[in-house]
Amino acid sequence: MSPRSKSQLRTALLQNRRSVPEAVREGEAEALRGWLSGLKISGRTVCAYVPVGSEPGSIALLDTLLELGARVLLPVARNDAAGIPLPLQWGKYRPGTLVAAEFGLREPPPPWLPAETIGEADVILVPALAVDRSGARLGRGAGFYDRTLHHAAATAQVIAVVRDDELLDEIPAEPHDVAMTHVLTPKRGIVALR
């Protein structure tokens, strides 16, 4: 793939995602959930996310993490008074308690934990529009995860969750981009990067 601007790539990937039929997305979400048993997470902390729109994943995936014995933390996204994204805060996932939030997201109710709490996670599932084989991740562009992931433990598995066709050969990267260690796709499962 020849490098394109991040903006052009985001637009193309979002258009492609929106064209995927709901039944296909549901099947892919179920496949993603099936790969979780390969993670050794009982008694450990997993930072995950609540998918919105056409993002890969599901609430059932979060429930499976709990069933596997993990402490599951979900992000809380906020901007400062000037509209600049702040590092993500974290809230404990409890089934049936998610509330509507800014940016069309769903999140756990307070109390919330500080951004540095991500450092307790052994596994971090990160939403992405795409990831490449070197671990470069393309998000939606707000920078919430880039402002937060530098708090992750060096030993954490940082896993971008994408559709199979969103694992690319190359993505334009910038110095502030935090590399993923793994990718999770419906067909490939969990694959080490870099």
Curated annotation (Swiss-Prot):
Similarity section: Belongs to the 5-formyltetrahydrofolate cyclo-ligase family.
GO biological process: folic acid-containing compound biosynthetic process; tetrahydrofolate interconversion
Catalytic activity: (6S)-5-formyl-5,6,7,8-tetrahydrofolate + ATP = (6R)-5,10-methenyltetrahydrofolate + ADP + phosphate
Biological classification of the source: Bacteria, Bacillati, Actinomycetota, Actinomycetes, Mycobacteriales
Gene3D superfamilies for the chain: NagB/RpiA/CoA transferase-like
EC number, as in UniProt: 6.3.3.2
Annotated keywords: ATP-binding, Ligase, Nucleotide-binding
GO molecular function, one term: ATP binding
Protein name: 5-formyltetrahydrofolate cyclo-ligase
The keyword ATP-binding is annotated on this UniProt entry: yes
Sequence positions that bind ATP: 6-10, 139-146, 177
Annotated source species: Mycolicibacterium smegmatis (strain ATCC 700084 / mc(2)155)
Enzyme type, top EC level: ligase
Recorded metabolic or biological pathway in which this protein acts: One-carbon metabolism; tetrahydrofolate interconversion
